[in-house]
Amino acid sequence: MTGAPYVHVGVLVHDLDAAIARYSLLGLTFMAPRTVRVERLVEGGRETALDLRIAFSIEGPPHWELLEAVGDGIYGPQHAETLHHIAVLHPDPVARRAELVREGFRETAAQYRRDGSLIVTYLDPADLNGVRVELIHAPVQDAILAWIAGEDAQA
């Protein structure tokens, strides 16, 4: 992933409001929490939809993303209270994912829009010394930055 910018660090938490209060003690300011509908999450051969409640730090990049645990998969409470992912911006995450799979990395989950376009893909943390990497596409990052700035954007 040479040259790929790290744009945010995601932390999965049990209680988003409590986590915001705690991280604020570090001098971070967070946007108001929002609920984001994930229309299509593909994980372990199954597809589901879910609502993610998240908040990003105003400070950054890299920003802090706090996500409230939900469901029984990659965002489930069994994965909470620890680093969830490091987001890496890539101009073509679909091609990059294919390259990394050829190199032996495994994808554990991916989010898609209704039209089938990729939002983010997650690499197996077992392939990176316990760190999950989220590959994120530039238009998604642009929407996140607009959202942090208070604009009404859809990531």
Give a label for each model feature.
Residues 17-36, 78-83, 93-113:
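Extended intrinsically disordered, low-complexity coil regions enriched in Ser, Thr, Gly, Ala
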